[in-house]
């Protein structure tokens, strides 16, 4: 049977030129894009490249990778996928001509004079179950149990002993999800920055804030993302805390640091934290540790998707996802000054809720 010529898709000349333009602008990154051992290629700012090889990050200086070249790469990529990237639409998700996934963020959604480029290379590795077994892939499966893990027992012992400095340090090191709560002027952001200093310096960090406060002088592999304070998801603003949280999922963060939860983006934060991104740190306004969960639940309900969930389900999700709540207070009336007033850490409740849900679904 003869095939009709319309069965064959022939790229038009314009599409070929657009693909060629993208590949031309990718040339400074070609050594790492062509390296089969590299899984991720990231540009946080002009002149530098971070690559992931065997779950470890490597740094390379690339002097010819200047700001203008990165802007042109973004423009060429947007044209290739028939999208837009500009000051008014500064975030772009696309697939490159060779199949790599790319995420580009330009100002004002990131620091002025910088552009964030994250390229995820597709994996062509094929493994059998026997290959996994030989690599020890199945040796560390933990049965669902009411008993706490050694790390949970360690943290609980530190908290019960009142050694809160060591408790917080280990909570950060063990990648627990931490919420710092308190009233305005209580020192939430200052404590957040102290906790961030306990994060290993070789991790890739992404901050999300409306005002630049979360500086990371000791963590070279970082990206600062920004959104306008008045931006609201319901009003279809192009850049909000929620859109940047979703963008983070394509930027290979080890941790996401969100300066403050204020509204519907709380739903996205919980969703991201529940997806396996441990070690996130954020803050919110609340009068106590217990009220923190009430505040977070109310803010989840400000999200269109969050409103579809029953309040009880939201509360259970919060207890499952949030590991530590630290409440800070400014005792201006009693002379105690800024201090931690409460610490919530209850792995037993978390474990019971998890087992309860598991039993219901069986």
Swiss-Prot record:
Q: Gene3D superfamilies, from UniProt?
A: 3.30.450.90, P-loop containing nucleotide triphosphate hydrolases
Protein name (database record):
Type IV secretion system protein VirB11
Instruction: Pull one GO CC term from this UniProt entry.
Output: type IV secretion system complex
Q: Any keyword Protein transport?
A: no
The Swiss-Prot or TrEMBL record annotates one GO molecular function as: ATP binding
Q: Does the keyword Ribonucleoprotein apply?
A: no
Give the species this sequence originates from.
Brucella abortus (strain 2308)
Pfam families according to UniProt: T2SSE
Spell out the family assignment given in the record's similarity comment.
Belongs to the GSP E family.
Q: Where in the cell is it found?
A: Cytoplasm
User: What's the encoding gene here?
Assistant: virB11
